[in-house]
Amino acid sequence: MTIYKIKYIPDIEEDYYLFLNDAIEAGKNYIDKIAMEEKDGWDSATITYAKNCLNDTLEFKGVVKIKAVNVHTHKGELK
């Protein structure tokens, strides 16, 4: 079974999603959050570029990264 790990790089946090689309959507929301928290903010072109990179490569330059992780179950437990 494959799940998707998303790593929020500036915050060093991780979340896991069963579906890739959910992980990408979470990454886009995080990009919006980071863009607003930046001192001068990001312009709309930068935000669009970041989200397109996330869609195409599953990561954006040290901000967010999505990775497929294979997990195996054993007696109802994830390993």
Describe the predicted segments one by one.
Residues 32-79:
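Short, mixed-charge low-complexity intrinsically disordered segments
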Residues 23-26:
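Short amphipathic alpha-helices within nucleic acid-binding modules
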Residues 1-13:
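Short aromatic-glycine-(Arg/Gly/Cys) micro-motifs in beta-strand/loop hairpins
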Residues 17-21:
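Conserved aromatic
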Residues 13-14, 39:
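Intrinsically disordered regions, especially transient/low-confidence alpha-helical propensity segments
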